């Protein structure tokens, strides 16, 4: 299921948009389980013709998937100050922890 159309992005099918929603439809929940998306999406970056010749980094920090290292329990255990350091913190803990639990069901 692609969110990329001939005229732009269909936000109703955009994984990044869906992961940021507080209330998801059963279809959106199923899509997140199927794709394993927890927060955001890099598909647009990967298919963009402007990025076709981009060099890959050897810096481990950028090569590893940060989301793969997260667990709902680790996020819940963070202090408010530590949680605030993450880009997704503006959305609140519940959205990200629910997404993680949904993917791991």
Region spans (language model):
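Short linker/helix segments within small regulatory modules
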Residues: 26-34
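Flexible internal linker/loop segments at domain or repeat junctions
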Residues: 68-87
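Conserved aromatic-histidine-acidic binding/catalytic patches
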Residues: 36, 88
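Active-site-proximal loop/short-helix segments
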Residues: 3-27, 65-73
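Iron-sulfur cluster-binding cysteine motifs and their immediate structural context
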Residues: 1-16, 37-39, 43-62
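Long, compositionally biased charged/polar accessory segments in the mid-to-C-terminal portions
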Residues: 81, 89-105
């Amino acid at each position: 299921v692609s969110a990329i159309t001939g005229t732009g992005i269909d936000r109703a099918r955009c994984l990044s948009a869906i992961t940021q929603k507080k209330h998801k439809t059963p279809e959106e929940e199923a899509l997140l389980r199927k794709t394993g998306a927890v927060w955001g999406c890099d598909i647009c970056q990967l298919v963009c013709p402007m990025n076709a010749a981009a060099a890959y980094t050897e810096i481990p920090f950028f090569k590893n998937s940060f989301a793969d290292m997260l667990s709902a329990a680790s996020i819940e255990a963070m202090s408010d100050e530590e949680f605030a350091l993450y880009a997704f913190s503006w959305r609140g803990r519940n959205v990200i922890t629910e997404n993680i639990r949904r993917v791991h069901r």
